[in-house]
């Protein structure tokens, strides 16, 4: 572990020199990439330097204890030695976590896609409830939410809704929401009071920048059509809606939320870039995931990850066996208790994998 930490510190010092190099300063892309790399290892280097400093103090205190001291001085040295040993242990644990490979997408913004699945109108209503839950959560964290496209049902639900979430750590926290969400409740239209089960799927995609995934015009087919509202009726006479097809992957994105064809195409391109990036990244991870199944699930959007039971005011996350009797609060966007537990489980699993590899 310490060889790796020393290598990280050496790289940090090298980056410091590079960032003051005129050739780097004059190259915006390289400057941004190196600054991002340095920012990503700063906490590790600072903690490692603190650890080395504590180690030096421990050695000095050991030497002091080997000398002839009066009782009071010896007692003080022993107390200091014990405190330093505890601090060293704490720093070692922090360093282990800091060495866990960071998801390169954690700092990215999020494209959120929610679709009503099994359950008809009730599934669409639940999709709407999930979107409102995530919107409130985003507000609590100071993130901005922008609806990019929506297919409302007319009864307060959505067959599909796509939104952009902009803010610090958005992907690092929202990525655990990928999967199928199940709801158990009595629909408002149910006169007999029977509990129905419906599902909605949630897709969390990191926003991909143009420099990360290049889409060539020759690989994209663009179709335009008239926008439609709930029920399928045409809502305008202009061909403002846009459908983009990425021919190599077959990925299709439609966008009709804006009255402007140009704005719809711009939004569709953002979603298309994110979906293509997500596809390539998933394929690259397949071999790794085959050797190590994540403690918090595979991230497959068909995987049932959570159940929301309204009659019992209960939410259960099936990946980590966590049950919370606070469904009313969860639906108001108070998701940190669940997400923090998922992050801890994920970090613990990665740390165990790291220890096994060593």
Swiss-Prot record:
- How is the protein altered post-translationally, as described in the entry? Methylated by PrmC. Methylation increases the termination efficiency of RF1.
Record-level Gene Ontology MF annotations: translation release factor activity, codon specific
Residues where N5-methylglutamine occurs? Answer: 233
Compartments where located = Cytoplasm
InterPro entries for this protein: PCRF (IPR005139), Pep_chain_release_fac_I (IPR000352), Pep_chain_release_fac_I_sf (IPR045853), Prokaryotic/Mito_RF (IPR050057), RF-1 (IPR004373)
**GO CC terms for this protein?**
cytoplasm
This protein's source sits in the domain of life called: Bacteria
Matches recorded under Gene3D superfamilies:
3.30.160.20, 3.30.70.1660, 6.10.140.1950
The cross-references to SUPFAM superfamilies, in alphabetical order and at most eight, read: Release factor
The Swiss-Prot or TrEMBL record describes its family as follows:
Belongs to the prokaryotic/mitochondrial release factor family.
Function, as annotated, reads: Peptide chain release factor 1 directs the termination of translation in response to the peptide chain termination codons UAG and UAA.
Q: What is this protein called?
A: Peptide chain release factor 1
């Amino acid at each position: 572990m310490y060889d790796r930490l020393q290598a990280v510190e050496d790289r940090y010092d090298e980056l410091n020199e590079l960032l003051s190099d005129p050739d780097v300063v004059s190259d915006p892309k390289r400057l941004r990439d190196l600054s991002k790399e340095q920012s990503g290892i700063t906490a590790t280097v600072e903690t490692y330097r603190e650890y080395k400093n504590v180690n030096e103090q421990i050695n000095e205190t050991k030497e002091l204890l080997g000398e002839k001291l009066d009782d009071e001085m010896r007692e003080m040295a022993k107390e200091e030695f014990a405190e330093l040993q505890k601090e060293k242990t704490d720093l070692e644990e922090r360093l282990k976590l800091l060495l866990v490979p960071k998801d390169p997408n954690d700092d990215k913004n999020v494209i959120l896609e929610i679709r009503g699945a099994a359950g008809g109108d009730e599934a669409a209503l639940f999709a709407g409830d999930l979107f409102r839950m995530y919107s409130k959560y985003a507000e609590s964290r100071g993130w901005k939410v922008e609806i990019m496209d929506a297919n409302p049902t007319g009864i307060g639900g959505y067959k599909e809704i796509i939104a952009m979430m902009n803010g610090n750590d958005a992907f690092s926290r929202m990525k655990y929401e990928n999967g199928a969400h199940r709801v158990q409740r009595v629909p408002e239209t149910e006169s007999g009071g029977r509990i129905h089960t419906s599902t909605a799927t949630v897709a969390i995609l990191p926003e991909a920048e143009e420099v990360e995934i290049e889409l060539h015009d020759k690989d994209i087919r663009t179709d335009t059509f008239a926008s439609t509202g709930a029920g399928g009726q045409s809502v305008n006479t202009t061909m403002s809606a846009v459908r983009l097809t990425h021919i190599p992957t077959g990925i299709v994105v439609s966008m009709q939320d804006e009255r402007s064809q140009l704005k719809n195409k711009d939004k569709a391109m953002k979603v298309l870039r994110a979906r293509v990036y997500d596809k390539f990244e998933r394929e690259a991870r397949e071999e790794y995931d085959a050797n190590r199944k994540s403690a918090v699930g595979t991230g497959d959007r068909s995987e049932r990850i959570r159940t929301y039971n309204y009659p019992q005011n209960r939410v259960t996350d099936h990946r980590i066996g966590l049950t919370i009797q606070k469904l009313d609060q969860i639906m108001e966007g108070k998701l940190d208790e669940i997400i923090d537990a998922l992050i801890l489980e994920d970090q613990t699993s990665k740390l165990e994998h790291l220890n096994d590899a060593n």
